[in-house]
Amino acid sequence: MLFRSEGDRQGLAGVVHATCLDGLYLVPSDRNLVAADFELYGMENREFRLKALLDQVRDQFEYIVMDCPPALTLLTINAMAAADSLLVPIQCEYLSLEGISALIEAMDRVRAGLNPKLELEGILLTMFDERTTLTKQVAAELRSHFPEKVFETVIPRNVRLAEAPSHGQPVLLYDVRSKGAEAYIQLAKELMKRVVT
């Protein structure tokens, strides 16, 4: 999308799609996004390509949410250069602790060189299983290092959350009464309190 929209001059507005939910729009990607990092390396202003596209439509939306891969790729750097803040989902696993350290370092570099307004909105614990010692340890470690940033809401391991994408639906449409859907509703409430205050 980053490159197709530039090539045919339709801009980002030409690839924004309405959904069945009022006020929710998507810009879909596909498997060709894998090659985007390679293409970006040869471009001028490569860290600001996504920001330039978002600036075309930013005033048309109250919030723009970008879902990024967990790897620190040039696409992720583009998202950080364009973002106001980051919401970082962390699986409750040991290696996630190392990953958050690398992400915070990258965020600091982006803030220093590309986007001084970038903030850490919060850290979201996912794949949370309160029955395991590891989950409790990871949660405690993150809460001790980032006391104001870890959301109270946690996203549990949940079968319905895992099933929903295979049915082409968000969990709130697939099974709104599931524990996973309830957790995301609670997260939205907690996030809005943070954003509004």
Task: List each language-model region with its residue ranges.
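P-loop NTP-binding core
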Residues: M1-T197
